[in-house]
Amino acid sequence: MYEKVLVAIDRSENSKRALAAARELASLSDGEVRILHLREQEVIPRMGLVADESPEEAHLWLESAVDELRNAGVKVTGEARNTIYGQTAREIAADATLHGAGVIVMGSRGRSDLTGFFLGSTAHKVIHLTDRPVLVVR
């Protein structure tokens, strides 16, 4: 099916379900999962949009997700990195291309509904920016 699965996570409940879906897809084909956690950096004080996660928290959460899949017998790698506010979808699409992902898995809504209101859905943007299939999990 898919030898390489990219799953984009952000600590939301939908991301937890996306992680489970990525695990299942990889298990079906003895594939590999790449977990990507992007931390938006820009602070826009007048709008009240600030990074709500420290780099340490991001890495701890990523390590937990990697361990979960590894303990389930899935080949897994992970990366947590910073991105510019509003560039998350482009980063996800570029990462899928760079690492040869056959499919991108992500949650339908992330942690911030306010961000979704102003910028649109990250999942929607990824669908339009990539030539890869995208599985959106709710």
List PLM regions with ranges.
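Short, flexible loop segments at boundaries between secondary-structure elements
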Residues: 134-137
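Structural beta-alpha unit
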Residues: 70-104
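Internal alpha/beta domain cores that form substrate/cofactor-binding pockets in large enzymes
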Residues: 34, 79, 83-84, 95, ...
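A short acidic, glycine-rich active-site loop
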Residues: 50-60
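Glycine-rich, Arg-bearing micro-motifs that act as flexible, cationic patches
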Residues: 103-125
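Small/aliphatic-rich secondary-structure junction motif
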Residues: 3-48, 52, 70-77
